[in-house]
């Protein structure tokens, strides 16, 4: 077998492009929560074959951005307060452990520091792309810093719903306040204070969950 040209590996497939396009529309709210998404509608809108549409939709199901039961039409999830509580419960179990491990090593990821700066900058442009994506990028940078492929896969399985949840209520994201909380997490990691790092992360996620639940109840 001849060697594979590395450039070929970086070229996105049609499924990749389609997946990204639909994902962006869902997160921006162009495809509203509760809306149905069918292979036929996607194939027609994007002028692609139905197998291509199906493959893209299957990825979105894995991402948590579509839900589909057996023989049922796929729909954009409409998350309720119990979904949010369970999501943040799961995230806290993972992320508290992550920052405690990082604190043991006094390992502050460079990428995480960049996200804190980017989040402060996003205060002037509070959009889904500028704020929510940066916010979640910070969290993921901590997870990836431990270099565990299985942990990353586990975490990524939650991130689609987390992104959707925040995108549906992104107006409540207090970027300056959240950036300050992130700075305290990184300071605790740098100091090697395992307890403080864990407590700061738990407190951050608990407050975020409470804000989201309160927002959902009010609306």
Question: What is each PLM-predicted segment?
Answer:
Residues 107-169, 178-187, 196-206:
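Conserved amphipathic alpha-helical segments that form helical-bundle/coiled-coil interaction surfaces
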Residues 174:
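Short beta-strand-centered segments that line the small-molecule binding cleft or hinge
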Residues 27, 61, 156-159, 190:
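Alpha-helix boundary recognition
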Residues 1-107, 209-219:
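Short linear motifs at protein or domain termini
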């Amino acid at each position: 077998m001849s060697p594979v040209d590395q450039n070929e590996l970086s070229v996105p497939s049609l499924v990749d492009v389609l997946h990204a396009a639909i994902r962006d529309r869902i997160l921006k709210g162009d495809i509203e929560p509760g809306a149905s998404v069918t292979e036929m509608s996607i194939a027609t809108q994007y002028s692609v074959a139905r197998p291509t549409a199906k493959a893209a939709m299957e990825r979105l199901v894995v991402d948590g951005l579509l839900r589909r039961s057996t023989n049922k039409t796929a729909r954009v999830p409409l998350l309720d307060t119990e979904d949010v509580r369970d999501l943040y419960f799961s995230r806290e179990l993972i992320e508290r452990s992550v920052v405690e491990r990082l604190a043991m090593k006094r390992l502050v990821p460079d990428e995480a520091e960049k996200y804190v700066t980017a989040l402060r900058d996003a205060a002037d442009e509070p959009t889904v792309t500028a704020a929510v994506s940066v916010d979640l990028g910070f969290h993921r940078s901590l997870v990836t810093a431990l270099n565990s492929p299985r942990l990353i896969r586990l975490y990524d399985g939650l991130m689609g719903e987390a992104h959707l949840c925040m995108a549906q209520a992104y107006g409540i994201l207090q970027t300056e306040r959240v950036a300050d909380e992130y700075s305290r997490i990184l300071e605790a990691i740098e100091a090697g204070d395992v307890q403080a790092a864990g407590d700061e992360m738990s407190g951050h996620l608990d407050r975020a969950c409470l804000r989201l639940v309160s927002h959902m109840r009010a609306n």
